[in-house]
């Protein structure tokens, strides 16, 4: 896919902060440091459109990115970071729940999980939440380059089993280092628009 435009538009906490609903939206969710920003940057062929950090919990708002005037990516705060206060975690949870349940132009959610590990309890809760609200889900297993080729099928099966993966959803192994999975991710995203 040729990317001719990839712009950060705004950050928001409440609906009044969201941009006008002019483009279909695809949200990106996952644990802190699972690679959401790296995923965005690899898809749009930029090094720093979405800021990456080695420190978990950096994203604290909904961040909206206009891609080619065709789709809006919405990077949501990572979950599961223990050093964030309970009050802050609850506020993030309410912010994300409000977005996921009220944003009519939300066409799907990319749920990123680390292929090296079984999904956490938080990953399972997020997947179940998205399915409960009948949202289309693309599960992207990041950090594919960090495991041996012979381990891939085993890890994919373990992730699908733990999530109780719905066969109607899409599953994509992905590496922001090698670019493996980029084309499959774009195809899945465009199927949901």
Curated annotation (Swiss-Prot):
Its cofactor is Mg(2+). It comes from the Bacteria. Mg(2+) binds at residues 37, 59. One of its GO terms (biological process) is division septum assembly. Belongs to the TRAFAC class TrmE-Era-EngA-EngB-Septin-like GTPase superfamily. EngB GTPase family. NCBIfam families: GTPase_YsxC, small_GTP. Necessary for normal cell division and for the maintenance of normal septation. This is Probable GTP-binding protein EngB. It comes from Exiguobacterium sibiricum (strain DSM 17290 / CCUG 55495 / CIP 109462 / JCM 13490 / 255-15). The gene is engB.
């Amino acid at each position: 896919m040729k990317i001719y435009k990839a712009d950060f538009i705004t950050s928001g906490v409440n609906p009044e902060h969201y941009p006008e609903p002019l483009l279909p939206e695809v949200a990106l969710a996952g644990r802190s440091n699972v690679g959401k920003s790296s995923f965005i940057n690899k898809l749009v062929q930029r090094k720093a459109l979405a800021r990456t950090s080695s420190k978990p919990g950096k994203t604290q708002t909904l961040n909206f990115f206009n891609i080619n005037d065709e789709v809006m990516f919405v990077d949501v705060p990572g979950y599961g970071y223990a050093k964030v206060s309970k009050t802050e975690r609850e506020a993030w949870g309410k912010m994300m729940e409000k977005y996921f349940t009220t944003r009519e132009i939300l066409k799907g959610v990319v749920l990123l999980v680390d292929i090296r590990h079984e999904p956490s309890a938080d990953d399972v809760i997020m997947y179940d939440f998205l399915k409960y609200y009948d949202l289309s889900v693309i599960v992207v297993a990041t950090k594919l380059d960090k495991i041996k080729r012979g381990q891939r099928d085993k890890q994919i099966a373990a992730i699908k089993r733990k999530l109780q993966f719905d066969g109607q959803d899409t599953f994509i192994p992905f590496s922001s280092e090698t670019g493996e999975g980029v084309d499959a991710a774009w195809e899945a995203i465009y199927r949901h628009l």
